[in-house]
Design a protein with these regions (language model features):
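Non-heme Fe(II)/2-oxoglutarate
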Residues: 1-58
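Catalytic core of non-heme Fe(II) oxygenases with the double-stranded beta-helix
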Residues: 52-151
């Protein structure tokens, strides 16, 4: 998925909404826009794997939004989303070789920093302030996020 997203020409700078352009980050909207059916299909397959691996305790696989974002050095993006109270976010890295201890790029939520490891996902209320933590390398951090219906 990371390789396909790197090759995509569908990146936008819409997020976080309401922030000046200089504070926005690159993102591909897969659902509902669905401009890239290959990436969207892979993303839905991944979400079902997350659901089967234990996500069913926290969410229904009813997707309201799915996107891939890229973050790098100098991207400081604390923000809140504006989803309904029945929505949670599922977030994970697409970089298979990302090493948080060496390069940073974790996840800050509710005042606590989390180490995002490749193949691991975090489920959270995105209506609370959250952001990527400082990245210490020129390498880009790719992440996929889903807005889904909370159980």
């Amino acid at each position: 998925m990371k390789l396909l997203s790197q090759r995509s020409d569908q990146w936008n700078f819409r997020y976080p909404e309401g922030k000046p352009f200089e504070q926005r980050f690159a993102k591909i909207n897969l659902v509902p826009d669905n401009q890239n059916t290959s990436l969207a299909g892979m993303a839905m397959g991944l979400l079902l794997q997350i659901y089967d691996a234990g996500g069913y305790k926290y969410f229904e696989p009813e997707v309201k939004f799915c996107g891939i974002s890229v973050k790098g050095v100098g991207i400081d993006d604390p923000h809140t989303d504006t989803w309904d109270a029945d929505t949670v976010k599922v977030l994970g890295l697409l970089n298979s070789d990302w090493n948080y201890s060496d390069v940073g790029g974790g996840f800050m939520y509710d005042g606590k920093e989390y180490n995002l490891k490749p193949t691991s996902f975090i489920i959270f209320d995105s209506n609370k302030v959250h952001c990527a933590t400082k990245i210490y390398t020129n390498k880009k951090r790719f992440a996929i996020d889903y807005a889904v219906k909370k159980i």
